[in-house]
UniProtKB/Swiss-Prot annotation:
Post-translational modification: N-glycosylated; by high mannose and/or biantennary complex and/or certain types of hybrid oligosaccharides; possesses different oligosaccharides chains according to its subcellular localization in the testis. Sheds from membrane raft by ACE and released from the cell surface of epididymal sperm while it passes through the caput epididymis leading to disappearance of TEX101 on spermatozoa; is essential to produce fertile spermatozoa.
Organism field: Cricetulus griseus (Chinese hamster)
Lipid-modified sites (GPI-anchor amidated serine): 226
Complex and partners: Interacts with VAMP3. Interacts with LY6K. Interacts with DPEP3; co-localized on the cell surface of spermatocytes, spermatids, and testicular spermatozoa, co-localized only in cytoplasmic droplets of caput and corpus epididymal sperm. Interacts with ADAM5.
Protein name: Testis-expressed protein 101
Leader sequence segment: 1-24
GO terms of biological process kind: binding of sperm to zona pellucida; fertilization; flagellated sperm motility; regulation of flagellated sperm motility
Origin organism lineage: Eukaryota, Metazoa, Chordata, Craniata, Vertebrata
InterPro entries the record matches: Fert-Immune_med_protein, LY6_UPA_recep-like, Snake_toxin-like_sf
């Protein structure tokens, strides 16, 4: 009987110890919503040392950033760090809409060691788009252009690169991951219809809702041009488990 009691006590202590360890994961915490001239040089993603939270069981550390830019505008930066529900560690990079015109990309990292969500900048995956080549090949299309944290009803009209297909005018609503924000975007785009975010409805822990006005469908190019440019539109997603990502990053140019 005594041996059974000792065995039960050991199992109980091990269970408490395991639960304590599971709850001891600490993550950096921050949320950022701003416009940057060149995020690869000016955006500091470092969290304050005292901004730390302890995760619940079943949560990992996460860091997520969404970047949206139109030609001639500043770049909208929406960034979140903290604990989030996730089963496995993973790094994901998505280019929703390629240049020329409005560009949208995101990066998210889920990791399972304390304060592992410690990226300091976005220079590894964000490079300022080179507009020198496309600016010399302008088509007949011009679009109101802006990226704003609020309304941009008086956006200036900008000429579009020849490979763009329409004027985009929409808003991106973001919630979760400490965010509750709306981005207003206008500009030339290679996307077809209301698909700046390629119909993807989440970015890391953030839920995404994209809505467009009627003006997004104005001034489409000829069907032949639309089909030709559509072939060059790309959406690519890279999702790797953490060990593979660490190997890849050590060889990053």
């Amino acid at each position: 009987m005594a041996a059974c009691w000792v065995h039960y006590l050991l199992l109980l202590l091990l269970g408490v110890s395991h639960q304590t360890l599971a709850q001891s994961l600490q993550c950096a915490v921050s949320k950022v919503l701003r416009l940057e001239d060149d995020p690869s040089r000016t955006f500091n993603w470092t969290s304050k040392p005292d901004k730390v939270e302890t995760c619940n069981p079943g949560e990992l550390c996460q860091e997520t950033v969404l970047l949206i830019k139109a030609e001639g505008t500043k770049t909208a930066v929406v960034a979140s760090k903290g604990c989030a529900s996730r089963e496995i560690e993973a790094v994901t990079f998505i280019q929703y809409t390629p240049p020329p015109g409005v560009i949208a990309i995101s990066y998210s990292n889920y990791c399972n060691s304390s304060l592992c969500n410690n990226s300091k900048n976005v220079s590894l995956f964000w490079k300022p788009p080179d507009t020198t080549a496309t600016s010399k090949i302008l088509g007949a299309l011009s679009c109101p252009t802006c990226v704003a944290l609020g309304s941009c009803s008086s956006a200036p009209s900008m000429p579009c690169a020849n490979s763009t297909t329409q004027c985009y005018q929409g808003k991106i609503e973001l919630s979760g991951g400490g965010m509750d924000s709306v981005l207003h975007i206008k500009g030339c785009t290679t996307a077809i219809g209301c698909r700046l975010m390629a119909a993807i409805t989440s970015v890391g822990p953030m839920t995404v809702k994209e809505t467009c006005s009627y003006h997004s469908l104005l001034q489409p190019r000829k069907a032949e041009e639309s089909r030709a440019s559509g072939r060059s539109t790309s959406l690519w997603v890279l999702e790797l488990l953490l060990p593979a990502v660490l190997v890849a990053l050590t060889h990053f140019p």
